[in-house]
């Protein structure tokens, strides 16, 4: 028996892979307590298990199973007590570069600390909190422009790759594990952060203020507040602060200028919905300037529409090029898994012009990327439409 315990896209992905490779009768899932069976900004493990006909179990039920081949925790919300299991093949993919950032809020601390690298780590589960022997990890870069939600999305994508890399050896038992060291081993408990109070501390340097805004920026749950307004961007100016930290030096239509310990900053407030609605006709120069009014190039609304998705649907190749130069994902997907290329396909068919489509493919757009119904772009095309796109499909 294989057990998947957890939540979100990584747990759903693991379940889909296992069912595809081994069948649905060999696996059971333990969804997190707050999994209501509905997809939102992340997919529901409970919903996917029901769709696939996979058994849903409780932790207590699983602890009694004797023939567990693999127990894998993927963002699971309960403490695993390995001594309660009938097996020692209990593993976790932790969202940090262990031994660093044990515990909670692993999307927050690397951002506020200004880290340039992060990782996802596969480890054995022991009686400690994220202290088990390390089997493997996958490292990746963290941009200075990344918010906490951007880091979380990178965790998800890299954990999928780590899962693919180690699934077979976890099942066979043909792997080695190394004890964690004590150097750079830090632990953050639940009480280390209070997301119910996201008013920013202004008695700090300009750099610290910017890191706070980026670290608290996780739109599905909250945006940081300054003067009670959702805040998305901090621009550090070259003007040394002459007034006390937190003093408002100037006010604009959608920003304020504030003093800090060292340099004045421009603070921009959230305008995402207006920004997205204006992309179809917005001049490129205005677009570049208005990027300060959203939480980064991969920001998205409640439908999962990001700037590059909206630009693709409306055929704004100039905007797409600018977004890609700033780090936007060419394979971005909305909350149904609809990709940038799928949106571009609609524009090209409406205008009978495939130049945008060809541009995206040449830049690395994946024509075989699956949406969350398990369909790729070709599945949505008629024979005439396939002929229109030619050999690209």
Task: Give short role names for the model-derived ranges.
Residues 1-220, 253-267, 271-273:
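One-carbon transfer enzymes
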